[in-house]
Structures are given as C-alpha cells and as structure tokens.
Amino acid sequence: MSHPHSHSIYLSELPVRKPQALGNPLLRKIQRACRMSLAEPDLALNLDIADYINEKQGAAPRDAAIALAKLINNRESHVAIFALSLLDVLVKNCGYPFHLQISRKEFLNELVKRFPGHPPLRYSKIQRLILTAIEEWYQTICKHSSYKNDMGYIRDMHRLLKYKGYAFPKISESDLAVLKPSNQLKTASEIQKEQEIAQAAKLEELIRRGKPEDLREANKLMKIMAGFKEDNAVQAKQAISSELNKLKRKADLLNEMLESPDSQNWDNETTQELHSALKVAQPKFQKIIEEEQEDDALVQDLLKFNDTVNQLLEKFNLLKNGDSNAASQIHPSHVSAPLQQSSGALTNEINLIDFNDLDEAPSQGNNNTNGTGTPAAAETSVNDLLGDLTDLSISNPSTANQASFGLGGDIVLGSSQPAPPVTTTNNSNNTLDLLGLSTPQSPTNSQAVNSSGFDLLMGFNPTTGTTTAPARTLVNQSPNLKIEFEISRESNSVIRIKSFFTNLSSSPISNLVFLLAVPKSMSLKLQPQSSNFMIGNAKDGISQEGTIENAPANPSKALKVKWKVNYSVNSTQAEETAVFTLPNV
C-alpha cells in the first residue's frame, strides 16, 4: 500500500506557487516531529529542527512559524500538543529571527484561532498550553529583550485575551529565566554576528511587509548591512564597553564585601553571584584583547582590569579556604571608572522597529558577494549610487496558498491587508532608494512619477512602444544563475530594461528576488517579476521589465546601476551583487 504522500511532483505552466511541504526539508522535519505515532515529544528532533533553522536562516523561521501555527489548530490533539512543544523549543533556541515571526499579527491570530469569543468553563489542554506560551513571551521577550519594541502584537494579544476574560497561568521563575537575556561579556565578533542575524531577519520582514515607513527603515538598514556605515562595529564596541563597566562595578562591590569585617561575607548569595560573574567573564578578556589590539587604551584598561579580577578571585578562594591572614594582604584597586566610548553617526538611528500587520511573501537570504572592481573605484561608484536611502515600495508575490492564514477566528487583533501600492515623488532632499520591491499598481494609477533616486523593484504601469530594437547583454553569470538585460531606448530620457534569469543548475531555484538601483538623478520603475521560482536548467525562467527615467541619450559618463539578487537553491540561501555599466543606447 503506497504512502498517501508518495506521489510525484508535476510542474505545470500555471502560476508558480511556493514548493509544498513534501519538497521542503524543514517542513518534513516539522511534520515528523508532530506525527501522531509519537508517544511523547521528540526533544532530540525538536532541537535538530532548531539547529536547522539557525543554520539556514532566510525563510526558515517564517516557514516554521506558519507550519506550526497550522499544526496547532489540527483537530488531533496529539499533533497540536507536539506542535506546541516544538514551538516552545524554537522560541527558546532560535532567537530574534523566530521571535520576530511569532510576534506577527497573523501568527498570533492563527494561534488563538480556535479560542471562542468568551472563555469556556474549563480550558482544554491546548488552550492552557497556548495561554502559558503567550504569558511566557509577555513576561520575557516583551519586557526584557533588546528588541522588545518589535513584540508589540504579543502584548496586544495578551491584553486582548485578558480583556475577553481569559486567565493566564503563573509562570515559574526557572521557566522565565530561559528566555530572559543573559548579561554575559561577548567579543566584538560575537556581538556583530548576532547583529547581522537580527538585521537580516528584520530586513526580510521589512521588505516583505512593504509599508512606506518600513521600507524607509529597510533603506537605512541596508546601508548599514552593506557596510556603508560602520555602526555595527560601533555598537559592538559600545556593548563591550557597557558590559565591562557593569563587570567593574561588580568587581568593586565584591571587593567591598570581601573587605568587610564579617568573616562569613564571602559565603552569601550575592558574593557568590558576583564571584561567578567575574569568573565566567574572564576568559573573554583575552579574546577581546586579540580582536581589539589596535585600540591601545582598551587593551591597557582590560589588562589592568584582568589583574584586579585575578586578585579578587584569589582573595575569594583564600577566604573560602579559611586563610583570612593571606586574604587580608590582597588589596585590589578600585576599577569602576567608565571606559571611553566611541560614537557613530548612526549609533541610535537603527532600532528593531515595531511591526504592524504583516502579509505573506518570500524572504531573502543574507550572504554577501560583491562584483565591483578595485576597492577604491568600487567604493566611489557605489557611494555615488547610494547616498541617503528613502521612499520606496514593495511587491508581494502570489500568496493564494496562505490566503486564510490568521483569519477566521473569534479573537483577532485586526484585519490584515496587503500593503497598498506606494508611489514616490521627486524631492530634492531625497537622494536614493536602495531596495524597493513594488506592489503591482492598479490600472487607475497611471500617472508617471519620478523617484528622487535609487529604487529597487518599484512597481509601475507599462509604457507603450519602443523605439530601438532590444539587444541582450550579459550582466552576470555564476554557477547557479545567469542574468541578462535587454536594453532599449524609448525616448531621449527613458531607457527600457527587460531582465532575464536562467537557471544554470539542475536544482530548482526558489524565492528569487531581484533588486536594482540607479543614480539619484534618475528614477527607476519596475514591474513585478514573472515568478520567483524556476525549475532546474530553465532558460529565461524568470523575467522582469522596467524603465529608467531622466536618463539622457548622450550622457557625459556611462550609466551605472547596482543590482542584487537573492534566491534559494538546494535549501541554501544565496546572494549575488555587483555594479553594472549599461551600454550606451
């Protein structure tokens, strides 16, 4: 007897949808972790799924959250319980990228989809587990995390359920401690890695959502992630400085307590905690010194602080062993003077923002490659292209397969609608847009608009007719993907570009998003892509048309555009980017 899911996958010429669970390794793992045949939750498999999500990133946290929300509403209670168990593991092990997904309005609406408008006399086990989960999130990531502003909808759902009469269980301190942030000293590289992961997840959600204020925020974030501003490094250094100051205050407090006439002062809970904090942090000192060796002031300060910590640890151990005479000969110096801090232009400019209603769309990856020429020339040309990044709009691919997600329950935070199309107007203060993905424009919105600069994937209404026969030009070719442009001139000021994408690998390419940018003196308008998925070895499997306005026919210098493409192949996120010089047309 054949398995009900053991059918082949047929790719028709109908509009392409996202690959089904059968072809997605993550969704297969989730289905296996929630299967009815399990006697109890499979913790090893659940942790394996968490590791998989942390490794893959990209769309993985989002795909997992959507799949789990649906499984939690399964009519089989065993499946729902296993899904909630897996959800708990992912929340506690996958960090901000997954927290961002559970804070979405649609996810929360789907989570409580089976809750009646008024509380039942007795909660079901599923309802109790869901209320417990929301209470845990409310008491931890909504209050104590560094990105708590992004968790607004969790707070709203907690407040709404309470208003409806639902009672939340009391959560033990030990359970809450797992999700509360730990104030451990980290090196700059560790901090920057965490920042990059969080920023990549935030950027995907900003792009997918497509509201003007979010896209402006995405522009700022893209600028930082692309390395045009060094705020990640600045913030990492400030975080180190802040944690060191806290440790120094702890060191001084421990020193005062060990100097106390009370001979048993070393053995109380506070002293033990201070001793533990210093002992755990000390191995990081050497790593920070290695990474920050060019900062002589920081290195010297750390070396001095390390000597003080060694003295304190030795004094603590002597008192613990009853050798108070030897301990009295050790007098560590006072160390809690604040370190000198650096400051950056955008130190406080980028915060993880409060997301409102979100709608479904694919995500991008966050690996970086650069195809520019010499570093100096590339930096000059790219900075000329980029400048400040402002108004843009976004386009969401078809989401028919998620149409009912987050809808239909008695308790909802509000209707979720796709972001409306956004048009940009010329503004002398705006310099350029990096990263605009457009919502398809309605037929009535036919007025031509000029962007102030650099739009990636701006929606537009097709203009009619071309005056020059298009010639195809190779833009880039990698082992997986070939990109070509057909470039023609419509008028003395308008260039038409049609992009073609060919899959050079035998594996399907999915979640492809192409971003394009032009100098700030010009305006870019792009139609939505023909698709975001193509089968292996598909020639011209995806195409996209667009126009560049305010492009003079005989420019004084060659027109350069910056392009970037994100896609998934073999369950791996890929990104390619470069600056391309258009041939004169």
From Swiss-Prot:
The keyword Transport applies. Disulfide bonds: none annotated. GO terms for biological process: Golgi to endosome transport; Golgi to vacuole transport; protein transport to vacuole involved in ubiquitin-dependent protein catabolic process via the multivesicular body sorting pathway. Residues 466-581 form the GAE domain. The keyword Transferase does not apply. There is a cross-link at residues 180, 287 (Glycyl lysine isopeptide (Lys-Gly) (interchain with G-Cter in ubiquitin)). GO terms for molecular function: phosphatidylinositol-4-phosphate binding; ubiquitin binding. Residues 365-374 have a biased composition (Low complexity). It is found in: Golgi apparatus, trans-Golgi network. Binds to ARF1 and ARF2. May play a role in the regulation of membrane traffic through the trans-Golgi network. Present with 2270 molecules/cell in log phase SD medium. This is ADP-ribosylation factor-binding protein GGA2. It comes from Saccharomyces cerevisiae (strain ATCC 204508 / S288c).
